[in-house]
Amino acid sequence: MAAVAVVGAGKSGQAAARWLALGGRRVVLWDGRDSEALRVVAGALAPFGVEAVLGREFVPEEPDLSLVVVSPGVRWDHPGLVAARARGVTVTGEVGLAWESLSHRRWLCVTGTNGKTTTTALVGHILKTAGLRAPVCGNIGRPVTDLLLEPEDYDWIVAELSSFQIESAQGIRPEVAVWTTFTPDHLNRHGTLERYAAIKAGLLMQARRAVLNGDDAYLGARRSAWPDAWWTSTQAPAAVSLAGKDICIENRPVLPVSAVRLPGAHNLQNVLMAVAACHLTGVGDAAIASGVASFIGVPHRLEAVGEYRGVRFINDSKATNYDAALVGLTAVPAPSVLIAGGQAKTGESGPWLRAIAERCASVVLIGEAAPLFEKWLRAQDYRAVYTAHTLERAVPMAFEQARAQGAQCVLFSPACASFDQFRNFEERGDRFRALIAALAS
């Protein structure tokens, strides 16, 4: 029996390995890391016949290897993948694997640098409100291959796709695709901004209908390149736009802006894109309005997690780059106390640093980026900087700063990846939430 290699033992790799093994394939799961948690994963997959290789980078050593399935966290130019392709072995991502078996379903895919999680979740919520079976999956937390393990007669598959997932699922052709925003991110993975943009654009070019955010500077400047797309804008005429106090589809009022429960101008952009996408699926105005009005947001994105002694705590762990963190800063009342830091990324930090100086009473820093961020802030003559190193120390420090300086809230918006101290932004946000619960208990 030909072997299948699954590279990466995260959620998507586990789901892919399980489904392939249940289909009678001989599966070897590879992960360059080794930990107690991964050994637990290996033990859970062993009854399905999955062999696990931990602590070694993937090499295509099986002579009868027929397929390699790649998790999103594994570089597409990983030497093992390059060697496999050179041998003529098919290499695909977990999303590409799912597409092969679910291409007969209607897919609605959302991508973008920022805003994609909220937009994806809102689309799923609206479709559910309309009575449709539309599971939400992909980069939002549930592997797409989970749908293969629980086959149902879905009306739509709503998938949030990162650039990593699109890169390794090049055959995917959604019915509707949404591009939320575009700013520099993941350049350590993709190399150039042009390559990063081309990956995002590729998804929309293969879609039957495209939705783009006209308020995004990069996308709006390329409007002529997408003449058949559905454009949205909070600032200018568009297929879905604002007129007075209403959200309109082709100048037809659908619901009042006041019905939107999400904070911040950026979330109004997300709402307009979700409205456009759901309209293109055939959902009526009443269901769209009801879905938007009943949607309260997603975990880890400007999530209110508690209040203690007059100070509100906001979990924005999903803000893993400067642009997302800037959005968070401008969405909460000033002055606030900011907790930031983690594993620093490349990108333009200037607007974020200026917003800190204008809106933050003080900043508490954690993680690897703390010395760099302190240097940047002090170079701007911003002095209210404190280093806590860990989230456990940062929370009480930030609370005391808020009380002392009359700040209304503590905002945890890292502007960094989480991998220096946590497995992902979800674990980081969950830890912040738990610390706030302990503080208030």
From Swiss-Prot:
Q: Which Pfam families match?
A: Mur_ligase_C (PF02875), Mur_ligase_M (PF08245), MurD-like_N (PF21799)
Q: Which InterPro entries match?
A: Folylpolyglutamate_synth_CS, Mur-like_cat_sf, Mur_ligase_C, Mur_ligase_C_dom_sf, Mur_ligase_cen, MurD
Reaction(s) this enzyme catalyzes, per UniProt: UDP-N-acetyl-alpha-D-muramoyl-L-alanine + D-glutamate + ATP = UDP-N-acetyl-alpha-D-muramoyl-L-alanyl-D-glutamate + ADP + phosphate + H(+)
Enzyme class, top EC level, equals: ligase
Q: Where in the cell is it found?
A: Cytoplasm
Question: Record keywords: Acetylation included?
Answer: no
Annotated GO CC locations: cytoplasm
Per the record, the GO terms for biological process are: cell division; cell wall organization; peptidoglycan biosynthetic process; regulation of cell shape
Cytoplasm as a keyword of this entry, yes or no, is yes
Pathway connected to this protein: Cell wall biogenesis; peptidoglycan biosynthesis
Q: Which GO molecular function terms does the record list?
A: ATP binding; tetrahydrofolylpolyglutamate synthase activity; UDP-N-acetylmuramoylalanine-D-glutamate ligase activity
Highest rank taxon of the organism: Bacteria
This enzyme's EC code(s): 6.3.2.9
The task this protein performs is described as: Cell wall formation. Catalyzes the addition of glutamate to the nucleotide precursor UDP-N-acetylmuramoyl-L-alanine (UMA).
| PANTHER family per UniProt | UDP-N-ACETYLMURAMOYLALANINE--D-GLUTAMATE LIGASE (PTHR43692:SF1)
Name listed for the protein in its UniProt record: UDP-N-acetylmuramoylalanine--D-glutamate ligase
**Source organism per UniProt:** Gloeobacter violaceus (strain ATCC 29082 / PCC 7421)
Gene that this sequence comes from? murD
